[in-house]
Design a protein with these regions (language model features):
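Transition-metal
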Residues: 1-206
Length: 206
């Protein structure tokens, strides 16, 4: 295919997004201060980019389905059958939610199960909106703190032992490892979590 098409991405207005960076980047008016969290340029079925053609705008995923080799090339079309990545621009103003990504095998099983159950692809209670395992690459355009994974168990045990505000968590970690500790902390009400975090912040400042 020798034709170049103009793509129009899709804005995602999640609560945690900022309200200036993406509108300024994409020359979009945002006088009301609506959050612009993400800008998607891809073929995800829930929000495919729009392709400007001579016949009007069309969804990128539909065009790929009609002519996969023309849009993806023979090798990618044969291996994936669709665009194998989703390019996003993020403007993170508030803390993001904690995410757990499935393995490729679990993603395929979960997606198939929800498809058979007839759950709409955009249903808010749906877990698997595609059958991919979500490996990610992040390129920071400004200062950005990202927490990824967990330290080794012995290192965390030493940390819980050495920091007085965390001593009460030692028995929980000793009994149920990371799963129990994480579950316990996520179920704390805000005041209880703050009682643990505030002394840690004070130590960090010192």
């Amino acid at each position: 295919m020798n034709t170049a098409y103009k793509l129009q991405g899709i804005h995602r207005h999640y609560e945690w997004g900022g309200n200036t960076f993406i509108p300024q980047l994409m020359h979009v008016d945002n006088a009301i201060g609506k959050p612009f969290a993400e800008y998607w340029m891809g073929a995800h079925p829930s929000a495919p980019a729009m392709v400007e053609t001579a016949e009007g705008s069309r969804a990128l995923d539909q065009m790929i389905q009609e002519k996969p080799e023309a849009f993806l090339g023979p090798k990618t079309a044969a291996q994936f059958g669709s665009l194998p990545y989703l390019f996003k621009i993020l403007d993170v103003e508030k803390m993001l939610s904690i995410q757990v990504h499935p393995s490729k095998e679990n993603a395929e099983k979960g997606f198939k199960k929800e498809q058979i159950a007839g759950l709409p692809i955009d249903a808010p209670h749906r877990n698997y909106k595609d059958q991919n395992h979500k490996p990610e690459v992040m390129v920071a355009l400004s200062d950005f703190w990202l927490l990824h994974g967990f330290m080794p168990a012995m290192a965390l045990k030493e940390r819980l032992t050495s920091l007085a505000p965390l001593h009460n968590l030692l028995p929980i970690f000793g009994m149920d490892d990371y799963a129990g500790l994480y579950s316990h902390f996520m179920r704390l009400d805000q005041s209880a979590a703050d009682a643990i975090l505030k002394p840690l912040l004070a130590l960090a400042v010192e």
